[in-house]
């Protein structure tokens, strides 16, 4: 029988034969099939460049339903099975049509029979439910492979060397021996009564306002808290090897940061409190009204964010060591040595984090960001409250970080005692800012004063030598305090 496939009009595929010329041929834009144009240039690696569709001879795009076919035959076969169309197909030429890329759209029955003849599998065509299940399985497999890859990458990350383990153990022991109440702080803490920090705010002569009772409670724990920070630093060999001048500068720069960090890691989300010095649990408003102002917000925010990291004692200890060995302190002598020490702690810190295998994605860079947050948020919050641009805290004339304050004595001490009552009962020098003091600055003054008193611990001086070195009321002599301390430490 003579075949005239180009004139066959029965059984056309409506989805592939939407536009035809008068002679029955399908119109093609720019002489190309739209599907072929969309797949132009794509050849799977397992196909030869000129591989042909086994059904129609057009350019193949891959394995589809167990055969190498083009996109057109793949779609035709899938639609036929999914919609169960093959029983409706018919052919006017006794199913003897020749199927090629020109005639494939003119006889659906012959095209479908050829699909079956070349081996296309009907059972591989999925219905909607099976297709959804397959996609879900694919996503599950991708997620499983992603987790396996993450585990492999964690296993391949370097862990601490024996030398780094020694550094880690020393820092951890230094932290534990100077951390008040240790891991039992929740059981031993005492909540500051609700009425403290909520009483009427007292206006100071310079216009600032503070709750004197809360302020008094906080000043009681500052000196022992600073003592523990100094003791922590002295237990680190790299710190003890530095000149006395650099030790003092580093302690002045990091003391508030380390104290804030120690308070932040003891944030309790259930009671929304911070435990100061391991013993006093305070609420945000109590800390704010007690003298720290907006700085209290920074510490509470830090505590909330750190609670998700679940840091252990070693990580807190190493974070403190990194804060201590910071080269951005003004006036340092051995900058290179301090920088190398910080790098050693950073490497040990990173390798210890790898050893713990945290489940938080990108744990290490996130933790480094928190380290910078500890340094910046406390100072910038305080500076913002005082109206200083850029968060730039004042610098002592000697280049030490004295928060823009000078040591004073005499009548000014008695004036502060009259203002603060018990909180103003200050033995030794106190601090006076060159400009009107904010409440949080007053607390920082006490912090700094205690730091001067404990600088003797760094250089091994006794109380009498410290008292004599700070006895002058002249501002010119005040600037020589740290030189005097350093000179005594160097003398036999």
From Swiss-Prot:
Nuclear hormone receptor that can act as a repressor or activator of transcription. High affinity receptor for thyroid hormones, including triiodothyronine and thyroxine. Residues 1-52 are annotated as: Modulating. CDD domains: NR_DBD_TR, NR_LBD_TR. The keyword Flavoprotein does not apply. This is Thyroid hormone receptor alpha. Signal peptide: none annotated. Zn(2+) 1 binds at residues 53, 56, 70, 73. PANTHER family: NUCLEAR HORMONE RECEPTOR, THYROID HORMONE RECEPTOR ALPHA. A zinc finger (NR C4-type) spans 53-73, 91-115. Residues 1-33, 457-492 are annotated as: Disordered. The lineage of its organism: Eukaryota, Metazoa, Chordata, Craniata, Vertebrata. Keywords: Cytoplasm, DNA-binding, Metal-binding, Nucleus, Receptor, Transcription, Transcription regulation, Zinc, Zinc-finger. Binds DNA as a dimer; homodimer and heterodimer with RXRB. Interacts with NCOA3 and NCOA6 coactivators, leading to a strong increase of transcription of target genes. Probably interacts with SFPQ. Interacts with C1D. Interacts with AKAP13. Interacts with TP53INP2. Interacts with PER2. Isoform alpha-2 and isoform alpha-1 interact with TACC1, but the interaction with alpha-1 is weaker. The interaction with isoform alpha-1, but not alpha-2, is decreased in the presence of thyroid hormone T3.
């Amino acid at each position: 029988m003579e075949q005239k496939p180009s004139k066959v009009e029965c059984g056309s595929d409506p989805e592939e034969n939407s536009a035809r010329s008068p002679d029955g041929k399908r119109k093609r834009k720019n002489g190309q099939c739209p599907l072929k144009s969309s797949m132009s240039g794509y050849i799977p690696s397992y196909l030869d460049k000129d591989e042909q569709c086994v059904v129609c001879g057009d350019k193949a795009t891959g394995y589809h339903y167990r055969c190498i076919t083009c996109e057109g035959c793949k779609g035709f076969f899938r639609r036929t099975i999914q919609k169960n169309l093959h029983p409706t197909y018919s052919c006017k030429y006794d199913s003897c049509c020749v199927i090629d890329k020109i005639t494939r759209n003119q006889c659906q029955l012959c095209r479908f029979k050829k699909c079956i003849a070349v081996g296309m599998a009907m059972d591989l065509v999925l219905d909607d439910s099976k297709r959804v299940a397959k996609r879900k399985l694919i996503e599950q497999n991708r997620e499983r492979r992603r987790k396996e890859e993450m585990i492999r990458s964690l296993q391949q990350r370097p862990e601490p060397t024996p030398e780094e383990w020694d550094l880690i153990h020393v820092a951890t022991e230094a932290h534990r021996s100077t951390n008040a109440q240790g891991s039992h702080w929740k059981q031993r803490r005492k909540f500051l009564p609700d009425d403290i920090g909520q009483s009427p705010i007292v206006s100071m002569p310079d216009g600032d306002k503070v709750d004197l009772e809360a302020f008094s409670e906080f000043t009681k724990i500052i000196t022992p808290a600073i003592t523990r920070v100094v003791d922590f630093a002295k237990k680190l060999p790299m710190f003890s090897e530095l000149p006395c001048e650099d030790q003092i500068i580093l302690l002045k720069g990091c003391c508030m940061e380390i104290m804030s960090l120690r308070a932040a890691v003891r944030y309790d989300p259930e009671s929304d409190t911070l435990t100061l010095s391991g013993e006093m649990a305070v609420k945000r408003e109590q800390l704010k009204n007690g003298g720290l102002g907006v700085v209290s917000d920074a510490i509470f925010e830090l505590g909330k964010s750190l609670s998700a990291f679940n840091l252990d004692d070693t990580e807190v200890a190493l974070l403190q060591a990194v804060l201590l060995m910071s080269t951005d302190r003004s006036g340092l002598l051995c900058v290179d040595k301090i920088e190398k020490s910080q790098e050693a702690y950073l490497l040990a810190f990173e390798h210890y984090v790898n050893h713990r295998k945290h489940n938080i994605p990108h744990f290490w860079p996130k933790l480094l960001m928190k380290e910078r947050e500890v340094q910046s948020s406390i100072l910038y919050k305080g500076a913002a409250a005082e109206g200083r641009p850029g968060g730039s805290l004042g610098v002592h004339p000697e280049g030490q970080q004295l928060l823009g304050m000078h040591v004073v004595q005499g009548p000014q001490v008695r004036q502060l005692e009259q203002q603060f009552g018990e909180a103003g009962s200050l033995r030794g020098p106190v601090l006076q800012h060159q400009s009107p003091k904010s409440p949080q600055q007053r607390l920082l003054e006490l912090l700094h004063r205690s730091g001067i008193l404990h600088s003797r611990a760094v250089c091994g001086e006794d109380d009498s030598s410290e008292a004599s070195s700070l006895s002058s009321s002249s501002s010119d002599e005040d600037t020589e305090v740290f030189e005097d301390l350093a000179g005594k430490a160097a003398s036999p």
